[in-house]
Each structure stands twice: as C-alpha cells, then as structure tokens.
C-alpha cells in the first residue's frame, strides 16, 4: 500500500472560482504548506492563477505539487454535454499537463443548485440519457489521455445521477475499465448510504484516486428525514474529519492494505462557506490522524 496524501481548496471552503466568502488563494496555498501537505488539487478553475508560469512559481516556492483537478459538466445533455466539457478540458488540460499532473476528475452537474439547493434537473436519467452519459464520458477520457496524458476518474457525487451504489455499479458495468476509472469519495459514498470499505474491496481495480472525509451521522439523519438539499447539508456540517463520523477509517485502511492500494488520497472536506480561521486546524489534525493510523 502506498497512499500519497494531499488536500484541496474544498477543504478550505472553496467551491467557486470567485466568491467573497472564500479566502484569498495566496492564504490557501500558505496554509496548505503550513499544515504539512505536499500535494494539492487545483480546485475550481480560476480560483488559483490560470497563468501556468505564475501558478508554477507560487507552487514551487511553497514546495507543492499537483495531483489533478476536476471539471463539471452534464455529459448526458445531447446538445451541450460534450461541447461544454471539451471547452473545460481545453482550458484546464494544458495547465495540468504543464504541472505534471496525472488525473482529471469528471463531476456531473448536480440536479440541485449549489448555492440555493433548488432543483434544476430531473433526479433520474432515462435509458438514452444514461447511454449519453457513458458515451460522453468515454469521449472525454479518450481526449484527455490522447491530448494531455491524463487519466479520467469519474467522481461519484451526491445529488448526481451516479451517487448510489446501484447507480455506480451500473456505471462501472457500462464503461471501459481501460478508459474510465472511479474517484471514490468516502464522504459522498457514505452520504448516499453506501459502504466505502466494502466498495473499495470489491472495486479496487477501478479506483486509483480517493477523496477522504467522513459524515456526521446525526446531520445525515436530519438531512434524510427532511430531504434537505446538498448545499444546505454541507452548511449544516454534514462532512467532518476522517477521525469522526460513520466511516470506520481503520477498517478503510485495512481494506487499502489488503488490496495493495497505490494512489492518491486527497483530503477533501466540503465546508462551504467556512470562516477563514476554521480550515487550518482541521487540516493539521487530519494529516496527523491519517499518519497515525497508517494512511500516508
């Protein structure tokens, strides 16, 4: 087992390229380095500098390296799905390639608004929509690999069409293993009622990339009972440090050892919006905890 630990802007309360409730990017990078991390994701494109030379200089002076980043789109949309994803890839791809990153995560657009929680799309895809999702994901994976040397990992995510275990199983069955891998997010998986430990054991060959966080059981119960949307659930404190919550991280570590996992483990604890003094202590505690239990 070799887990390369990193973190992400998400763990500092960053969800958008620009928002007055988010801390300046310079402070984010400073605090990542202070907390002891060496690897990061770039976060929403435009939050960190998009000029490659500027970004490389800022990373280098803090001793930081980049594992990858993500794009968000609607691959099932017959009109805008591929064109939007291709634009996103053409913007982000050269930066990831220039920084030596290996992974591109695809996040399907939520069927609720990230800021308001209001419904914006159907909760379920029909058969044709699901096939478009699969086909567009394949196309994105092929293009990302051929043009930028990136491996595509599909981020199964709350309030998207691939969040519950049966939906993820169907997606895995429908996609080509040599093209499409899965980003297993322990928090999102548990949020949707799944067991990330068992899922890791079953599907480890398709999982080269992890997001590490936990879920507060009491908040999850309230969210489920009242059907509270994702954005509001995050603001309520749904996601917590790995040392707390419903996911048994010692058991998850054992699963990683048993399957001889080699890959990234990115600490990505959603906490938007977050007071500026909140993320750093959590980041330090989380890194210490993961090292203590033998992850990273």
Language-model region placement:
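Active-site mouth loops of central-metabolism enzymes
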Residues: 10-24, 76-86, 122-130, 240-243
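Histidine-acidic metal/acid-base catalytic patches
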Residues: 1-36, 60, 100, 138, ...
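Active-site acidic/histidine proton-transfer and metal-coordination neighborhood
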Residues: 81-182
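Glycine-rich, proline-tolerant flexible connector loops at the mouths of alpha/beta enzymes
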Residues: 39-59
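Conserved beta-strand positions in the central sheet of alpha/beta enzyme cores
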Residues: 41, 68, 105, 153, ...
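N-terminal small/glycine-rich loop or linker at the start of catalytic domains
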Residues: 1-17, 67-76, 112-120, 230
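Active-site-proximal loop/turn and secondary-structure-junction residues that shape catalytic pockets
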Residues: 11-13, 44-46, 72-75, 108-112, ...
